[in-house]
Amino acid sequence: MDDFDRDLDNELEFSHKSTKNVKVHATFESMNLKPDLLKGIYGYGFEAPSAIQSRAIMQIINGRDTIAQAQSGTGKTATFSIGMLQAIDTNAKDCQALILSPTRELAVQIQNVVKHLGDYMNIHTHACIGGTHVGDDIKKLKQGQQIVSGTPGRVVDMVKRQQLSTRNIKMLILDEADELFTKGFKEQIYEVYKYLPPSVQVVVVSATLSREVLEMTNKFTTDPVKILVKRDQITLEGIKQYHVQCEKEDWKFDTLCDLYDNLTITQAVIFCNTKLKVNWLTDQMRKQNFTVVSMHGDMKQDERDSIMNDFRTGNSRVLISTDVWARGIDVQQVSLVINYDLPTDKENYIHRIGRSGRFGRKGVAINLITKEDVATLRDFEKYYSTKIREMPMNINDIM
């Protein structure tokens, strides 16, 4: 957390659609947190709350349904984790909080954050995700898990098998809500929700909250507190955005090869829109003797875990992926993102480039475009009130 840019965070402005008169807590001490939780917060590297934390944590602790929206890297995960850990009764072994995420990697990452923050609290937490052995889940859940972080499909399965008791769940957290509410997950979330006690507190968290998502949250929340960052600030100010005009699609590959030496200075993620393209690009790069790893949703879970682990530890430097990786995955060293394909929707653009400057860190995003992409790029600029400049001839000038 020591690279967090406090000045940038202080400049965040909140939307006029936010709930008025939300009290701002400038220190963690002023929140009257459990001493063991406070110890975990400082141990994790936080010194003072970020803008979103200073507003949302106490609302969650006070039991209010909460909708929190801020860009990637502002401490959203810690916001709901701290609120949740404060509310947990450590003497009761039943599941008391359920977190749903759109990807397995994100569910595991959240579990790790909860573990670290709750380090001194003797909290039992489990990641309940697809692609792992069902028997292992059942065994873990039988041991008693106060907090479960999972993906909707596996959680529904465990609830229906009566292996995950929902009787004492007092908090439901929907992370990356805009992704969760897309068609694939919507029905599963409704399915989980109907098993929960009527008094359950709902916390909705996301970097982007479209109008459709806000309408959807009305079905789950009662008089929610809304803490919303102004949209034109959602693009992290610390991220420099560029485009490279390629005459045709085939030339993108040559451009990427030219850039490769600069990719490995730190670590880079290259995004493609399809699994086929990820596999193709990975093969092409390797044929040219470039070292890359790749990841997409069709891979087995243990393979995805191993790739993520290598990337986290810095053993691999360049990752080629679909949007499965774009959602909230935190690898501190990533300072360059390349969109080999522009994302198909505006919301995913922020999720992708949000990787490259987490928590106030500086970063660079490079978009490889053909003339067919120019209109889409202009749309992104307009939507986020930002400027995506042409990349200078010498990439070293921007790295």
Curated annotation (Swiss-Prot):
Residue ranges occupied by any Helicase C-terminal domain in the UniProt entry: 238-399
PROSITE patterns from the UniProt entry: DEAD_ATP_HELICASE (PS00039), HELICASE_ATP_BIND_1 (PS51192), HELICASE_CTER (PS51194), Q_MOTIF (PS51195)
GO BP, sorted A to Z: maturation of SSU-rRNA from tricistronic rRNA transcript (SSU-rRNA, 5.8S rRNA, LSU-rRNA)
Stated name of the protein: ATP-dependent RNA helicase FAL1
Primary role: ATP-dependent RNA helicase involved in 40S ribosomal subunit biogenesis. Required for the processing and cleavage of 35S pre-rRNA at sites A0, A1, and A2, leading to mature 18S rRNA.
GO molecular function: ATP binding; ATP hydrolysis activity; RNA binding; RNA helicase activity
Domain of life: Eukaryota
Binding site for ATP: 70-77
Record-linked Pfam families: DEAD, Helicase_C
Entry's Gene Ontology cellular component terms: FAL1-SGD1 complex; nucleolus; preribosome, small subunit precursor; small-subunit processome
SUPFAM superfamilies for the chain: P-loop containing nucleoside triphosphate hydrolases (SSF52540)
Domain Helicase ATP-binding: 57-227
Record-stated family: Belongs to the DEAD box helicase family. DDX48/FAL1 subfamily.
Domain notes: The Q motif is unique to and characteristic of the DEAD box family of RNA helicases and controls ATP binding and hydrolysis.
EC code: 3.6.4.13
Catalysis performed (reactions): ATP + H2O = ADP + phosphate + H(+)
Species in which this protein is naturally found: Scheffersomyces stipitis (strain ATCC 58785 / CBS 6054 / NBRC 10063 / NRRL Y-11545)
Keyword line: ATP-binding, Helicase, Hydrolase, Nucleotide-binding, Nucleus, Ribosome biogenesis, RNA-binding, rRNA processing
Placement of sequence motif DEAD box: 175-178
InterPro entries given in the database record: DEAD/DEAH_box_helicase_dom, Helicase_ATP-bd, Helicase_C-like, P-loop_NTPase, RNA-helicase_DEAD-box_CS, RNA_helicase_DEAD_Q_motif
Subcellular compartments: Nucleus, Nucleolus
Motif position, Q motif: 26-54
